[in-house]
Amino acid sequence: MEPRAPPRLSVSSPRRESGATVPSHSPSTLLSCASSETATEKRRRWTGVLSVFGGVLVHVCLGTVYTWGTLAVYVVSYMRLLQIQSLQAASDASTLLERTSEEDGSSLSVFAFASAPSLVRLSDSAWVLASQFAGMTLGMPLGGIAQKTLGPCRTVILGGALMSLAVGMAPVLLHSYALFVTVFGVIQGVGLGLAYTAPLLCGLAWFPEKKGIVSGAITAGFGTGALLFSPLQAAFLNPLSIAPSQAPYASHPAELYYDVSDSDQLEILLRVPRLFRLLAVCYLLLVSAGAALLRVPAASPGVRTPGASACVFDEEAALVKSLEREEVRDETREEARATVSVRTALVSWTFWSLWTLFFLNGLAICFTASFWRLLAVDRNTRAYILTETQLALVGAAASACNAVGRLAWGHLADKRGFQTSLMGLSALWSLLLFFLPNAAPKGGLCYALAVSGSFFCLGGNFSVFPSAVASVFGPDAIGHLYGFIFGSQLASSLGFAYLTQRVAQTIGTDGLSTLMGLCTALTAMSVFCLPALSPTPRKRHSFQKQS
């Protein structure tokens, strides 16, 4: 028998574990395989990039939840107008009306009603943001379930439609604060939750090795939403930048509302219902555009057809490198599929440690998003230190920092671990919250920097915590487990709303800011001290053994 020629060096397909061999190919076949590989890789990458961009568009719409900090004074003032009109129509206290009319004119009767204890106040506006986060907490697990049957595109459109419906119904509910909170708050929040996780899952499925960057980029859209919409809303409602001037409560001189007895301020309030209708249409169009770009990679993108699954090489080292990169991606995907079950995670100390830390930072999130404008009031002059236009610019800058913070802290989580990122974020935020009550008296620039820095830290939470869940429990856990972690925001939003009713009336917004600074400081110290959050590499393997 003639001796066989030595076999040519070949690279096997992913099926090589079963012993399958791959025949050699001619140089022309090799070049065709390489070019086909390159073209396919480019198409896949662009599809992934477009899917991430679609997720950004969706989150831009969802992020308009943070425009409530700008809208609150207008909406609450309009509610007070409706309530005052109702009180005037139903009041039998004619002697009060006659006395006030004789002393100071008819406008004083309006002021008498403006200080009525039954009227909604700015401190009550915290319940709106709290109810929105509560609805998001309920909607996120439903979104994870819905996308398994409906797919990401239809799930996002369903959530966006529910959100737009809630915003569109708001004008007919402004007469009742309870109904407004239920629909504009809870139901809109459920729509937000339904549409929130699907873009993240799509992005992480395309780029599982870049958890922090992908989650940061998509959720940066959440911060950009307020950046884009807050100035537009302020320009539509208040093009002349007229500041509120009515201070009906002597014990809280910084609590200012728009005066319905002033014709210019009344004209501002009458634009509120039309704004909600316009926003409803814009939200639905924006969500639909983003959802149309969402795509999910194939179930096993590393498996190729037999004819193109392997190539033989002689001197073509470039093709070898391409296949090696594909093997690395295959290993990453196999690791991504090894996800901890919900049952195992819910009984772990790590889960409840993350839940508690998100709760503590969630209190500061609610405070920063709801009360940043109130800290711009000079307590001595009872006036804002900035004009309405300047406040809108501060809000836009803060929203930009919100978006940038998600990218920056997410990138740090990728490079140094989520523990380092979360500890640095919370420590910096604590310092800013301690300083924020004293920022306005030092000047508008100082106030703007403090607010922007606070939003820079606020945004980081929404990229660091998803990155933490993916790092500890597996990337696929974002869909079914992050919703439970986000449940801490239900507790923190309700807890903050309770604090504003019980504590804020005593310690004021300055004391509340200091209290929130203590919460974020506790988060920073807990990350450093809790053994459940120690930065052990491969921590997830211990969970997998338990499951």
Swiss-Prot record:
Stretches of the chain found on the membrane's Cytoplasmic side: 1-45
Subcellular location: Plastid, Apicoplast; Membrane
One GO biological process term: pyruvate transmembrane transport
Pfam families documented for this protein: MFS_1
MF terms in GO: transmembrane transporter activity
Family statement: Belongs to the major facilitator superfamily.
GO CC annotations on file: apicoplast membrane
Region span, Disordered: 1-33
Alphabetized Gene3D superfamilies for the sequence: MFS general substrate transporter like domains (1.20.1250.20)
Record-linked InterPro entries: MFS (IPR011701), MFS_Riboflavin_Transporter (IPR052983), MFS_trans_sf (IPR036259)
Broad class of where this protein is predominantly found: plastid
Topology within the bilayer: Multi-pass membrane protein
Name used for this protein in its record: Apicoplast pyruvate carrier 1
Keyword Transport on entry: yes
PROSITE patterns: PROKAR_LIPOPROTEIN
The keyword rRNA-binding is annotated on this UniProt entry: no
Biased composition (Polar residues): 21-33
Keywords: Apicoplast, Membrane, Plastid, Pyruvate, Transmembrane, Transmembrane helix, Transport
Function: Along with apicoplast pyruvate carrier 2, forms apicoplast pyruvate carrier (APC) complex, which transports pyruvate into the apicoplast and may also transport amino acids like methionine, serine, glycine and tryptophan with low efficiency. Required for maintaining pyruvate-dependent metabolic activities in the apicoplast, such as synthesis of fatty acids, isopentenyl pyrophosphate (IPP), dimethylallyl pyrophosphate (DMAPP) and methylerythritol 4-phosphate (MEP). Required for maintaining the integrity of the apicoplast. Required for normal parasite growth.
Subunit structure: Interacts with apicoplast pyruvate carrier 2.
Transmembrane feature ranges: 46-66, 126-146, 167-187, 189-209, 212-232, 278-298, 345-365, 385-405, 417-437, 445-465, 467-487, 515-535
Organism lineage string: Eukaryota, Sar, Alveolata, Apicomplexa, Conoidasida
